[in-house]
Amino acid sequence: MVGFKATDVPPTATVKFLGAGTAACIADLITFPLDTAKVRLQIQGERQGPMQAAASAQYRGVLGTILTMVRTEGPRSLYSGLVAGLQRQMSFASVRIGLYDSVKQFYTKGSEHAGIGSRLLAGSTTGALAVAVAQPTDVVKVRFQAQARAGAGRRYQSTVEAYKTIAREEGFRGLWKGTSPNVARNAIVNCAELVTYDLIKDTLLKAHLMTDDLPCHFTSAFGAGFCTTVIASPVDVVKTRYMNSALGQYSSAGHCALTMLQKEGPQAFYKGFMPSFLRLGSWNVVMFVTYEQLKRALMAARASREAPF
C-alpha cells in the first residue's frame, strides 16, 4: 500500500468538499505557469487572419511561451492571476468535485451501482453549479494572465482593483462575462474528467490490475486529463477569448466562435492544445492524488480523535 490507508468509514460530504478545494489549490500552485502559457497561446492572433497570425506569432509552443514570458516580463509573469486562481479553485473545485459523489448518490437514490448516465448527469450538474458560484474569479484570473497583450500599461494592478474596475466599467455583467461558454465548458469538463476518472479507476480495481492506492490514482487521473483536453479544448478557447475580450468586441460567445472560424479556421479551436494537455494532465494527477490522500488523512485524523483512550 502506497500513501494513506483507506479507512473503513467513507469520507463525509464536508471532508470531500474541503479536500477537493484544498487539493485543487495545491494543483494550481504547481501547474499555474502551464495554464498561463495556455491562455497566451489561445488569445494569440485573435485579431488577425491565420497567415498574419502565423507570421507575427510572439509565442511558439509551451516551452517557447514560458521562456519568452520570463525573458520579456520576468518569472513573476507566469503566476499573474494566481490569487484569483486560488480563489477560483477554493470555491469552484469544492463544488464541482467535492459535491460530485453526493449528487451522484442523489441521482441513483443512494445505490452504490451508478451507471454512466447518472455519472454524466452528476458531472454536468456540479460543473454548471460551480460556474454559478465562481465565474467572477475566473474572469479576473484570465484577464491577469492575458494582460501583457493589452499594451504597454498593465490592465489591472491588483486582484481587488480588477474586481472593482470590471464592475465599474462593464457593470455586474462584466464579472459574469462568458458564463454561457463556461457553463458549457465545465459541464463537458466535469463529465469528461470525473466520469473518466471514475470509470478508469473502477475498471482497474474490478480487473484487479491495481489496488486502490497512488499508482491507480495516478493512472486514472492522467487518462482523465487526456480525454478531457481532447473533448473540452474548443469550448475552452472560446471561453478564454470571450472573457478576455474588450467591451463590444464580440456580441456573444457564439459570435466569438464564428469569428474564430472565419478568420483563423477550425484549427483555432485547438490553439494551446499541448499546454492545455500538459496543464490538465499534470493538474489532474496532482489534484486527484492529493484529494484521495487528503480524504484518507482527514478521516484517519477524525477516527483517531473519536477513538476511546
Curated annotation (Swiss-Prot):
Q: Which GO terms describe its biological process?
A: adaptive thermogenesis; C4-dicarboxylate transport; cellular response to glucose stimulus; glutamine metabolic process; glycolytic process; long-chain fatty acid transport; macrophage differentiation; mitochondrial fission
User: What main location does UniProt list?
Assistant: mitochondrion
Gene3D superfamilies in the record: Mitochondrial carrier domain (1.50.40.10)
Where are the residues marked Important for inhibition by GDP as a site? K141, R185
Q: Give residue spans on the Mitochondrial intermembrane membrane side.
A: 1-16, 104-119, 200-217, 295-309
Q: Name one GO cellular component term.
A: mitochondrial inner membrane
Q: Which InterPro entries match?
A: Mit_carrier, Mito_Metabolite_Transporter, Mitochondrial_sb/sol_carrier, Mt_carrier_dom_sf
**What are the UniProt keywords, alphabetically?**
Membrane, Mitochondrion, Mitochondrion inner membrane, Repeat, Transmembrane, Transmembrane helix, Transport
Keyword Repeat present in the record's keywords: the answer is yes
Query: Which Gene Ontology molecular function entries are recorded, alphabetically?
Result: antiporter activity; chloride transmembrane transporter activity; GDP binding; L-aspartate transmembrane transporter activity; malate transmembrane transporter activity; oxaloacetate transmembrane transporter activity; oxidative phosphorylation uncoupler activity; phosphate ion uniporter activity
Q: What is known of its domains?
A: The GDP-binding domain is located within the hydrophilic cavity, with GDP phosphates likely forming salt bridges with the charged residues, Lys-141 and Arg-185. The long-chain fatty acid-binding domain consists of an hydrophobic groove between peripheral transmembrane helices 1 and 6 near the matrix side.
Q: What does this protein do?
A: Antiporter that exports dicarboxylate intermediates of the Krebs cycle in exchange for phosphate plus a proton across the inner membrane of mitochondria, a process driven by mitochondrial motive force with an overall impact on glycolysis, glutaminolysis and glutathione-dependent redox balance. Continuous export of oxaloacetate and related four-carbon dicarboxylates from mitochondrial matrix into the cytosol negatively regulates the oxidation of acetyl-CoA substrates via the Krebs cycle lowering the ATP/ADP ratio and reactive oxygen species (ROS) production.
* Name of the protein in its database record: Dicarboxylate carrier UCP2
Native organism is: Bos taurus
Encoding gene, per UniProt annotation: UCP2
